[in-house]
């Protein structure tokens, strides 16, 4: 399984990391906002299955700060809708 340092190397400096038994949630907040604000976060779910790591985004939105960090477990995660 990836550790925090590996996750940071894959994604440039997330604002917050939530490590779970199965992987990580990484949060990126819109400039000038914080963890407790609503609808300001891009959330990435990283899971390691064997030697493969998947990177999925809340509803596949990989360039939008539409989500709330405290609701991260309630979103569906999918592969990116567009390349950035």
Predicted regions and their residues:
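Intrinsically disordered, compositionally biased low-complexity regions
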Residues: 2-84
